[in-house]
């Protein structure tokens, strides 16, 4: 068993049963290709999403260290911050969130609805900043201030994307491999690539469990040149933690994130509407809409390695639909 070292790491079980892996019949007919979807949008806390897999490991480490406060950072409409706040509430911990407004909007829905509304429901302490120019340093500075107030803080990086958090997506690769075994031979796997933890964790896990499947990250915030070192560095850090080798090529497509992170584009919004109308499944304008636009566009461009079945990793994010109204 190549991933046996996973069991060495403390983990809180928030998710329970595996999330569904489903065939999309109407969407497949529309695209002329077999499309499957991994439904991490329906993880069972705070309207779902992929970050809960990372938080199973990160929150366990926080409790091990005796923390009483979780500190993290992100944009106003961060799915990660929303799920971190929910985990803190469930565990009886304080949560402090350092937020930025990366698109400089004054739109009321973006500033108060969607994920931001949920942060208030989870009783999150909000600290605003002009920009997360050096989030690791900014989080450490915030942790120092919180500690001076008598709390015992545990810092969770942006997106939960360090080697420990990314183990959640090595675990996910195990789940995917078990669900596919004897049912479908997945040719390609598509995932949104942002803070890089989900992408890197899948890269390590799938290399050992489904080596014939190519993994493609569709960038949501950076060019290939900027994103590649982030994914590779995390891939190698995860492999080191698990005492494995990681030599799988990291494939990135950066044609679909313009005009920038957190700004919807036409292709992404069309993908959101298409999957909603054909399958009743909700994507979001920031991550999964753009990643699905990459899947759709690259079928017609024949950029996949062959014409076999494609698995789309649905990382969640639907609460942001309300924040981006009326653009949706």
Swiss-Prot record:
Gene3D superfamilies hit by this protein: 3.40.50.1100
Entry's Gene Ontology molecular function annotations: D-cysteine desulfhydrase activity
N6-(pyridoxal phosphate)lysine: residues carrying this PTM: 51
Keywords: Lyase, Pyridoxal phosphate
Matches recorded under Pfam families: PALP
EC number: 4.4.1.15
Keyword Magnesium assigned: no
GO biological process: D-amino acid metabolic process
Enzyme class, spelled out: lyase
Swiss-Prot/TrEMBL cofactor(s): pyridoxal 5'-phosphate
Cystines in this chain: none
Record field: catalytic activity: D-cysteine + H2O = hydrogen sulfide + pyruvate + NH4(+) + H(+)
Keyword Transmembrane helix: no
Domain of life of the source: Bacteria
Annotated family: Belongs to the ACC deaminase/D-cysteine desulfhydrase family.
PANTHER family: 1-AMINOCYCLOPROPANE-1-CARBOXYLATE DEAMINASE-RELATED
Self-association state and partner proteins as the record states: Homodimer.
Role according to the record: Catalyzes the alpha,beta-elimination reaction of D-cysteine and of several D-cysteine derivatives. It could be a defense mechanism against D-cysteine.
Name of the protein this chain belongs to: D-cysteine desulfhydrase
Lineage: Bacteria, Pseudomonadati, Pseudomonadota, Gammaproteobacteria, Enterobacterales
Gene behind this protein: dcyD
